[in-house]
């Protein structure tokens, strides 16, 4: 397990002050989800959350205090309006009252690919000083929801989090928590990070990972496997630009294969986005096939299709990740939060079996 650097713990507050970068479908589901479970009973079990009260923090303790985007239909608008604006097309689960949080113009950098650029209008507002904005809003945790392939932009916001002393939750497949150089930056600064690349509650990756492990545990030789995903949101449109996909494919592939003992040839594992189908909106369809050999080398094949609303499928996981990051911040812990990263992320610094990762995260919550 990685070493953490502990600094004198700041006085813990009763709320988790969150900033969001990238006010897309995932941000919409996150904000709506906090509203949906605002009055949930502490002891109840609700879909998609480890606990209603995660350590000292209830879902309703998550407060959105800042947001950054580049879309002209979102920048300058209240967060409650921006989450339903422009190309956002996820399912609505809750009404959201005005937040008095105005979406600010962040720097574009490499955050907009060619398909995004053809679809949205960029705000002509001047980018704000992100570090100053984080400090002024007294942010505890910054959640990065930038589009896939935003390497430069994600690292820019990661550095802003370090400079502002704000915990960082890296929801996209840019390797920061799992990069030893970046991990050391966060450790040296005494700033916690949970990353990289958020898992869904029950998505293509987790089902594929579990079934591949089931093959191995039951003595079936897994010879080859594939996972194809189609969806209708801006994430899938962005991923038509294959040059932005390298880290996404690596993240999804290692999330499945890292749980297995055997090594695979590159051609025997194909995992990644496939196409954009506009009428699916924020739904994702995953087609997964596993081919193996059972007793006597007799073929044993499994094929399934998973249909989900993509963004709500990870919103609860982010709520847990945010609260884990805040607990680490309260305790003065810097660097990657291994238990939270291993259980909640596809590409953590340290891959652990899911049951062990969950047990370690439960221990972390208790302290």
From Swiss-Prot:
| Keyword annotations from UniProtKB, A to Z | Inositol biosynthesis, Isomerase, NAD
| Gene3D superfamilies per the UniProt record, alphabetical | Dihydrodipicolinate Reductase, domain 2, NAD(P)-binding Rossmann-like Domain
What is any one GO biological process for this UniProt entry?
phospholipid biosynthetic process
Residues binding NAD(+)? 78, 137, 157, 200, 235, 248
EC numbers listed for it are 5.5.1.4
Give the required cofactors. Answer: NAD(+)
Q: Under which main EC class is this enzyme filed?
A: isomerase
Q: Which reaction does it catalyse?
A: D-glucose 6-phosphate = 1D-myo-inositol 3-phosphate
Q: Which InterPro entries does the record match to this protein?
A: MIPS, Myo-inos-1-P_Synthase, Myo-inos-1-P_Synthase_actino, Myo-inos-1-P_Synthase_GAPDH, NAD(P)-bd_dom_sf
Gene Ontology MF annotations: inositol-3-phosphate synthase activity
Q: Which domain of life is it from?
A: Bacteria
General function of this protein? Key enzyme in myo-inositol biosynthesis pathway that catalyzes the conversion of glucose 6-phosphate to 1D-myo-inositol 3-phosphate in a NAD-dependent manner.
PANTHER family assigned:
INOSITOL-3-PHOSPHATE SYNTHASE
- The protein in question is named Inositol-3-phosphate synthase
- Organism field: Mycobacterium tuberculosis (strain CDC 1551 / Oshkosh)
Give the classification, highest ranks. Bacteria, Bacillati, Actinomycetota, Actinomycetes, Mycobacteriales
